[in-house]
């Protein structure tokens, strides 16, 4: 029995990019096509089948532990970027500032899509698996602050539940600008004890 449900929610790819040297800078550089082998975009600083654990999994592993890399790609929505900019009092938030790999348009509340959802290119079948919601961080605030002094600190509250998701490659291939990604979601109910677990 299939465990994933194709939906009619479609995302159009409106921006692609890579961050080639995370140690040097957070910002990403735009691309027309993203090559996606199993390890993620080869040029991307977050690529690889494994990675070193970071703050997002600090309660599970000591920092620097080698773990499977479920953070190969960072995806945000055009709609969420517009809302972040609006709340910050800016005309626009550029995807480069966030160091993202991809911007999609057309999927509402994109940052809250369920973990383990798939984003599948309708034409090529290239598929990304959503790991989890991304979290706003002070590093983006610092990038914005350089261009807009006094504004950078507004990023974290404005980007709460709008920072997009992290994902990894399940079926390799390429995704190009203008591609259409269909959202597939896990066909299971919400765990009844979720609120208790979160508050415990």
Mark where each language-model region is:
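Electropositive, beta-rich accessory/interaction domains or terminal extensions
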Residues: 1-118, 122, 132, 192-198
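Glycine-rich active-site loops that engage anionic ligands at enzyme catalytic sites
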Residues: 104-108, 112-171
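Short, well-ordered loop/turn sites that connect or cap secondary structure elements
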Residues: 113, 174-177, 181-183
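Short, surface-exposed secondary-structure boundary micro-motifs
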Residues: 124, 133, 180, 186-187
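Short, Lys/Arg- and Gly-enriched loop/turn segments at beta-strand edges
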Residues: 129, 138-140, 187-200
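Acidic/glycine-rich phosphate/pyrophosphate-binding loops and surrounding catalytic core
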Residues: 147, 154-155, 167, 180-185, ...
């Amino acid at each position: 029995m299939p465990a994933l449900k194709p939906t009619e929610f479609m995302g159009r790819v409106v921006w692609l990019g890579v961050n080639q040297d995370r140690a040097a800078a957070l910002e990403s550089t735009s691309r027309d096509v993203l090559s996606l082998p199993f390890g993620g975009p080869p040029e991307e600083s977050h690529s690889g089948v494994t990675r070193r654990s970071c703050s997002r999994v600090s309660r599970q592993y000591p920092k620097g532990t080698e773990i499977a890399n479920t953070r190969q790609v960072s995806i945000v929505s055009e709609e969420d970027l517009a809302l972040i900019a609006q709340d910050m009092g800016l005309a626009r938030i550029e995807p480069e500032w966030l160091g993202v790999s991809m911007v999609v348009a057309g999927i509402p509340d994109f940052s809250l899509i369920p973990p383990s959802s798939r984003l599948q290119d309708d034409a090529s079948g290239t598929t990304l698996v959503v790991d989890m919601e991304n979290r706003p961080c002070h590093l983006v605030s610092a990038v914005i602050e350089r261009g807009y002094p006094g504004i950078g600190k507004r990023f974290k509250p404005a980007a709460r539940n709008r920072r997009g998701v992290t994902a990894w490659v399940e079926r390799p291939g390429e995704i190009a600008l203008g591609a259409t990604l269909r959202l597939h979601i896990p066909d299971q109910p919400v765990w009844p004890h979720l609120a208790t677990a979160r508050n415990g």
